[in-house]
């Protein structure tokens, strides 16, 4: 039995930035630092930041006056930003810049009076934040959420000739393209983003897991169950006909999964750290894995800048 590692895998630039913002805020301002929602969807990362002095909350009313709060990588609504400003909270924004790009698109369409269709998963914090970029004060348009291709048939927009779409950044590329095609068939005048909203890291990791699926008879995806992009990776492998499981860490591996398997693929979602992958590799060796190799993949060199104040504090 051998193990093939996907490439790329694990942390993306947006996740790296978000985690670093929390760490540096704690180092420079001191604990506690409040973080609205899990800064990224990974239990190991969140637990580590808690030990350093981060306090995770779901709403700003859990944050004391005069405290520092960090917005998670998934982004927040305008209402949350306005509440933080009204209360005078010190804010560091860890929203992924690629999510911010989608926010700007929604706000632009809103100002132009267009209706907007957001393709995404209801209840996901990124979707809630993006939906919250629309406001009646900004324009006359309306925003609609579409989760799957079936909902396109029943969608009833107010302005079919003045319509645009945008997407959550962590969706299945194939599923999203199907929804977009159905929307365009129904609303030929619909506008789209200048560049795809699904982020480069999501695309690259989905391409990599498909490479694994072509060569393996089992694919393990390291990631937490509330991680959208990690779930999509496991779904893609299964869709390509390969047995696949999403695991938080090595302790969740069932030895029965690898019985009779010759080639095990291993990847990690964009919010899963390499240390968890290393732990899975160690467990697979204990279960009989004889060799580990890494597939070629798309190189990633993207780096997102930290907030200016945290950059300055590092050298002061």
Swiss-Prot record:
Residues annotated as signal peptide: none
CDD domains: lytB_ispH (cd13944)
EC number: 1.17.7.4
Domain of life of the organism encoding this protein: Bacteria
Name of the top EC class for this enzyme: oxidoreductase
Chain positions recorded as isopentenyl diphosphate binding sites: 41, 74, 124, 227-229, 271
Binding site for (2E)-4-hydroxy-3-methylbut-2-enyl diphosphate: 41, 74, 124, 169, 227-229, 271
Coiled coil feature spans: none
Metabolic or biological pathway: Isoprenoid biosynthesis; dimethylallyl diphosphate biosynthesis; dimethylallyl diphosphate from (2E)-4-hydroxy-3-methylbutenyl diphosphate: step 1/1; Isoprenoid biosynthesis; isopentenyl diphosphate biosynthesis via DXP pathway; isopentenyl diphosphate from 1-deoxy-D-xylulose 5-phosphate: step 6/6
Cofactor: [4Fe-4S] cluster
Alphabetical keyword list: 4Fe-4S, Iron, Iron-sulfur, Isoprene biosynthesis, Metal-binding, Oxidoreductase
Entry GO MF terms: 4 iron, 4 sulfur cluster binding; 4-hydroxy-3-methylbut-2-enyl diphosphate reductase activity; metal ion binding
GO biological process terms, semicolon-separated: dimethylallyl diphosphate biosynthetic process; isopentenyl diphosphate biosynthetic process, methylerythritol 4-phosphate pathway; terpenoid biosynthetic process
Catalytic reactions of this protein: isopentenyl diphosphate + 2 oxidized [2Fe-2S]-[ferredoxin] + H2O = (2E)-4-hydroxy-3-methylbut-2-enyl diphosphate + 2 reduced [2Fe-2S]-[ferredoxin] + 2 H(+); dimethylallyl diphosphate + 2 oxidized [2Fe-2S]-[ferredoxin] + H2O = (2E)-4-hydroxy-3-methylbut-2-enyl diphosphate + 2 reduced [2Fe-2S]-[ferredoxin] + 2 H(+)
Record has Flavoprotein as a keyword: no
Binding sites annotated in the UniProt record for [4Fe-4S] cluster: 12, 96, 199
A Pfam short name: LYTB
Gene3D superfamilies hit by this protein: 3.40.50.11270, 4-hydroxy-3-methylbut-2-enyl diphosphate reductase, catalytic domain (3.40.1010.20)
Membership in a protein family: Belongs to the IspH family.
Protein purpose: Catalyzes the conversion of 1-hydroxy-2-methyl-2-(E)-butenyl 4-diphosphate (HMBPP) into a mixture of isopentenyl diphosphate (IPP) and dimethylallyl diphosphate (DMAPP). Acts in the terminal step of the DOXP/MEP pathway for isoprenoid precursor biosynthesis.
HAMAP family (alphabetical): IspH
Protein name: 4-hydroxy-3-methylbut-2-enyl diphosphate reductase
Organism: Xanthomonas axonopodis pv. citri (strain 306)
Lineage: Bacteria, Pseudomonadati, Pseudomonadota, Gammaproteobacteria, Lysobacterales
Gene: ispH
């Amino acid at each position: 039995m051998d193990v093939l590692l996907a490439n790329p895998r694990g942390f993306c630039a947006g996740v790296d930035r978000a985690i670093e913002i929390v760490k540096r805020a704690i180092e420079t301002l001191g604990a506690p630092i409040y973080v609205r929602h899990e800064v990224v969807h990974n239990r190991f990362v969140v637990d580590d930041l808690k030990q350093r002095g981060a306090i995770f909350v779901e709403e700003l009313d859990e944050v004391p006056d005069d405290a520092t709060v960090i917005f998670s990588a998934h982004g927040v609504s305008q209402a949350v930003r306005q509440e933080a400003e009204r209360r005078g909270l010190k804010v560091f924004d860890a929203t992924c810049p690629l999510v911010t790009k989608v926010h700007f698109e929604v706000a632009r369409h809103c100002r132009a009076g267009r209706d907007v269709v957001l393709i995404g998963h209801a209840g996901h914090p990124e979707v809630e934040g993006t939906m919250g970029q629309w406001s009646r004060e900004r324009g006359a348009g309306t925003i609609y959420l579409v989760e799957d291709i079936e909902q396109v048939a029943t969608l009833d927009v107010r302005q079919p000739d003045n319509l645009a779409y945008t997407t959550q950044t962590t969706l299945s590329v194939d599923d999203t393209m199907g929804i977009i095609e159905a929307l365009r068939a129904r609303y030929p005048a619909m506008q789209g983003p200048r560049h795809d909203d699904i982020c480069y890291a999501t695309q690259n990791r989905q391409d990599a897991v498909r490479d694994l699926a072509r060569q393996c008879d089992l694919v393990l995806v390291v990631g937490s169950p509330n991680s959208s992009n990690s779930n999509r990776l496991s779904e893609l492998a299964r869709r390509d006909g390969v047995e696949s499981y999403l695991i938080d860490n090595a302790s969740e591996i069932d030895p029965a999964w690898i019985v009779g398997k010759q080639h095990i693929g291993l990847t990690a979602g964009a919010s899963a750290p390499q240390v968890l992958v290393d732990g899975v590799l160690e467990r697979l060796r204990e279960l009989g894995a004889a060799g580990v190799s890494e597939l070629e993949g798309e190189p990633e060199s993207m780096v997102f800048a930290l907030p200016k104040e945290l950059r300055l504090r590092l050298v002061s």
